[in-house]
């Protein structure tokens, strides 16, 4: 298994939908989560870069699909945050369409990291993301974020509860805890990404360039 240097991750581009993404080759691992789940902070912690992914004081600001390259043909994808109450309904529907289309049609997408605030896990849209991934045979890592907000006993109870709940999806779904503030869980995230990038088959360029 190759240990990648995530500190070398760099921004490639932003796209409003799947049609504006670069060619569907290599391996992509996407990060998804509700608007306040700590997704940008997790990406910045993983790469040890303070502003690789912009953290916004206004949840729901990230409306684009953001691509980052870790190494040649190996990309991380920051998907639009979902579920923020103050975003207009039409925009919510647009985001959900873009998310669904990306998850269903992007061949190079081979792993999905779903981030959830450990205090409020498995909301409807979180479950929908996991269902989409499992239905598309995409491996899932659930990261329960902001673990520093709970005492040790409550953390373990939440972790066990979510691990039990995801069994119902009947897919490749692993659950771990994560804290950007305490740098807890970063090693497990890196190990999972290394495994995915090393063991999964990259998508090759086709003759017609599709």
UniProtKB/Swiss-Prot annotation:
<feature type="binding site">
    <location>
        <begin position="33"/>
        <end position="40"/>
    </location>
    <ligand>
        <name>GTP</name>
    </ligand>
</feature>
<feature type="domain" description="EngB-type G">
    <location>
        <begin position="25"/>
        <end position="199"/>
    </location>
</feature>
<keyword id="KW-0460">Magnesium</keyword>
<keyword id="KW-0342">GTP-binding</keyword>
<keyword id="KW-0547">Nucleotide-binding</keyword>
<keyword id="KW-0131">Cell cycle</keyword>
<comment type="function">
    <text>Necessary for normal cell division and for the maintenance of normal septation.</text>
</comment>
<feature type="binding site">
    <location>
        <begin position="78"/>
        <end position="81"/>
    </location>
    <ligand>
        <name>GTP</name>
    </ligand>
</feature>
<dbReference type="GO" id="GO:0005525">
    <property type="term" value="F:GTP binding"/>
</dbReference>
<dbReference type="InterPro" id="IPR030393">
    <property type="entry name" value="G_ENGB_dom"/>
</dbReference>
<dbReference type="GO" id="GO:0000917">
    <property type="term" value="P:division septum assembly"/>
</dbReference>
<feature type="binding site">
    <location>
        <position position="62"/>
    </location>
    <ligand>
        <name>Mg(2+)</name>
    </ligand>
</feature>
<dbReference type="GO" id="GO:0005829">
    <property type="term" value="C:cytosol"/>
</dbReference>
<protein>
    <recommendedName>
        <fullName>Probable GTP-binding protein EngB</fullName>
    </recommendedName>
</protein>
<feature type="binding site">
    <location>
        <begin position="178"/>
        <end position="180"/>
    </location>
    <ligand>
        <name>GTP</name>
    </ligand>
</feature>
<keyword id="KW-0132">Cell division</keyword>
<dbReference type="GO" id="GO:0046872">
    <property type="term" value="F:metal ion binding"/>
</dbReference>
<feature type="binding site">
    <location>
        <begin position="60"/>
        <end position="64"/>
    </location>
    <ligand>
        <name>GTP</name>
    </ligand>
</feature>
<dbReference type="InterPro" id="IPR006073">
    <property type="entry name" value="GTP-bd"/>
</dbReference>
<comment type="similarity">
    <text>Belongs to the TRAFAC class TrmE-Era-EngA-EngB-Septin-like GTPase superfamily. EngB GTPase family.</text>
</comment>
<dbReference type="InterPro" id="IPR019987">
    <property type="entry name" value="GTP-bd_ribosome_bio_YsxC"/>
</dbReference>
<feature type="binding site">
    <location>
        <begin position="145"/>
        <end position="148"/>
    </location>
    <ligand>
        <name>GTP</name>
    </ligand>
</feature>
<dbReference type="Pfam" id="PF01926">
    <property type="entry name" value="MMR_HSR1"/>
</dbReference>
<keyword id="KW-0479">Metal-binding</keyword>
<feature type="binding site">
    <location>
        <position position="40"/>
    </location>
    <ligand>
        <name>Mg(2+)</name>
    </ligand>
</feature>
<dbReference type="InterPro" id="IPR027417">
    <property type="entry name" value="P-loop_NTPase"/>
</dbReference>
<keyword id="KW-0717">Septation</keyword>
């Amino acid at each position: 298994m190759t240990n990648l240097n995530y500190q070398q991750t760099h921004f490639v581009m932003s796209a409003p939908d799947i049609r504006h993404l670069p060619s569907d080759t290599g391996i992509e691992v996407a990060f998804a989560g509700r608007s306040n789940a700590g997704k940008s902070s997790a990406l910045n912690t993983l790469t040890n870069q303070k502003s690789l992914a912009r953290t916004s004081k206004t949840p729901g600001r990230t409306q684009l699909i953001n691509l980052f390259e870790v190494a040649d043909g190996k990309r991380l994808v920051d998907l639009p945050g979902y579920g923020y109450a103050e975003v207009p309904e039409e925009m919510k529907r647009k985001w959900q369409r873009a998310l669904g289309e990306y998850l269903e049609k992007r061949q190079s997408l081979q792993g999905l990291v779903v981030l959830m605030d450990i205090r409020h896990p498995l909301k409807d849209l979180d479950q929908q993301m996991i269902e989409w991934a499992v239905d598309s045979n995409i491996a899932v890592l659930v990261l329960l974020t902001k673990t520093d907000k709970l005492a040790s006993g409550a953390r373990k109870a939440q972790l066990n509860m979510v691990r039990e709940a995801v069994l119902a999806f009947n897919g490749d779904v692993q659950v771990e805890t994560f804290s950007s503030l305490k740098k807890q869980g970063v090693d497990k995230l890196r190990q999972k990404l290394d495994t995915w990038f090393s063991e999964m088959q990259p998508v090759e360029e086709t003759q017609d360039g599709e």
